[in-house]
Amino acid sequence: MPNKWKKILHSQTPKEWLQKALESQEILLIDHAHCEKKAATTAISLIHRYPDKNLAKKLSPLAREELLHFEQVLRVIKKEGYKYRNIRPGAYAKTLYEASSKQEPQRLKDTLIICALIEARSLSLIHI
């Protein structure tokens, strides 16, 4: 893992994850599609929830980019002969959100930090 991800995440993704991912390509792709969709909906939700914070300028392009990624992953799923379907969300994001503040303004800050951690973790996996 590049040093910049280690500084942000404070831990490396286990090497065993790669082997498990290779053995579970269908579920990995479906989960990836769901993560892209969730990133887009979270961006839109934040724009809606905090209209006074001027988030639309930054988050609207992000939502479009994440939806583009969602569509790209859907094409890969179809190409591989898999079928997109609903799956149970993983515990990683849920655990982070459960530990976050429910009171403003900390709720917004925690949400943005959690989104950044999830994105950083996914980017760190590229460098296994």
Task: Give the ranges of each region predicted by the language model.
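Short alpha-helical hairpin
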Residues: 1-23, 37-42, 93-96
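Acidic/His metal-coordination segments adjacent to aromatic residues that form catalytic metal sites
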Residues: 14-30, 91-116
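Long, hydrophobic/aromatic N-terminal blocks
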Residues: 21-64
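Membrane-helix exit/interface motif
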Residues: 43-47, 74-77, 81, 99-101
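Conserved alpha-helical segments that form or flank metal/cofactor-binding pockets of metalloenzymes
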Residues: 57-90
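Conserved small/polar residues in nucleotide/adenosyl-binding loops
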Residues: 126-128
